C-alpha cells in the first residue's frame, strides 16, 4: 500500500504533468516556442545554454530522459546542456537536493536511475533517509551523501534552480529554455517528445543570430 506522503507527491506530479499538456502560456499559431521576457542572462559565457527543467516525479520527464541523453551526445560544441530540477511544492525540494547531491558526488550516472527507481520500481524516494539508503545501494558512501545533501552548496544550487524556473516562467515539465530567450516543451511541439528536441535544435540556430 502506498503511504499517504507517496500518494500525495505522485498526485502533485500528475497535476504538474497535466499542467504541461494544458499550459498557461500558449504559443501563437503554429509557433512551437514562446519568448522569455525579459531574457535570462547566461551563466556560461560564449556558450548557448539549453536548460532542461524537470522533476523526478514527472512521468513525462522520465519518458524523455533517454532522448535527452542521446541528444546531448551530439549537441554542437557551442552548446551546453544544464539540467534544472524544479519543485512545484515544498515536498519536492528533497528531490532537487538529490539531483545536486549526486552531481557533487560525481555520480551523474545515477540520474536516469532515479527515474527508474521512482516510476518503474515504485521506490518512495521522497525524504533524505530513503534517498540515502537508495544511494548507498548504488555504491555511494552514505556518510558523504548525508553531508553533501545538507551542504550550503547544494542548498544554493536548489535556490538557483527555483530562480531559473521562475525567470523562464515554467509552469510544467519537461520544458527547455534555449539561449535565455526562448522556451519550448513537448506540448508546444504538438505533444511530441522528439519534436520538442527538434525545436530546441532550431532555437539553437536562432540563438546564434
From Swiss-Prot:
Gene Ontology MF terms in the entry: disulfide oxidoreductase activity
Residues annotated as domain Thioredoxin: 28-166
The keyword Chaperone is assigned to this record: no
Protein name in the entry: Thiol:disulfide interchange protein DsbA
First and last residue of the signal peptide: 1-27
Organism whose genome encodes this protein: Bordetella parapertussis (strain 12822 / ATCC BAA-587 / NCTC 13253)
Family: Belongs to the thioredoxin family. DsbA subfamily.
Location in or out of the cell: Periplasm
Pfam families listed in its UniProt record: DSBA, Thioredoxin
InterPro entries from the UniProt entry: DSBA-like_thioredoxin_dom (IPR001853), DsbA/DsbL (IPR023205), Thiol_disulfide_DsbA (IPR050824), Thioredoxin-like_sf (IPR036249), Thioredoxin_CS (IPR017937), Thioredoxin_domain (IPR013766)
Keyword Zinc part of the UniProt annotation: no
CDD domains in alphabetical order: DsbA_DsbA
Disulphide bridges, residue numbers: 58-61
Major localization class: periplasm
Function: Involved in disulfide-bond formation. Acts by transferring its disulfide bond to other proteins.
UniProt keyword terms in alphabetical order: Disulfide bond, Periplasm, Redox-active center, Signal
Any GO CC annotation of this UniProt entry: periplasmic space
